[in-house]
UniProtKB/Swiss-Prot annotation:
Any GO molecular function: haptoglobin binding
Annotated function: Involved in oxygen transport from gills to the various peripheral tissues.
PROSITE patterns for this protein: GLOBIN
Name of the protein: Hemoglobin subunit alpha
Keywords: Acetylation, Heme, Iron, Metal-binding, Oxygen transport, Transport
Organism domain of life: Eukaryota
GO biological process terms, semicolon-separated: hydrogen peroxide catabolic process
Recorded GO CC terms: blood microparticle; haptoglobin-hemoglobin complex; hemoglobin complex
Tissue-by-tissue expression: Red blood cells.
Keyword Acetylation: yes
Residues where O2 binds: H60
Amino acid sequence: MSLSDKDKAAVKGLWAKISPKADDIGAEALGRMLTVYPQTKTYFAHWADLSPGSGPVKKHGKVIMGAVGDAVSKIDDLVGGLAALSELHAFKLRVDPANFKILAHNVIVVIGMLYPGDFPPEVHMSVDKFFQNLALALSEKYR
């Protein structure tokens, strides 16, 4: 699903508003994913504490949202811009690509909770399309 110029503008505009709280969004989204989708915990079994708000969850939430911010800056070429990250997840971490969509869903939920006034249906749709394209780009090396 391609992103229109309007979609790209909506994603960039929302990112400008939420990026100061990106670390908190990432930690909350990851904590929710690990709770609501416990099968995702298998990728983080080496962490001592997988509970929401724990140090490792906060730290990785920051990493995740840093990658999302990077993706926003590479919105015109997600496949090329995220090739190294796709390779890491496919060959080293061996993450099932279905989990990218699960995490994206949780990020969208948290954005909607924290920024309801900045997240009308039109922006939600653009952000959802962006995350679909992001998940597809991260899945590129699995083929």
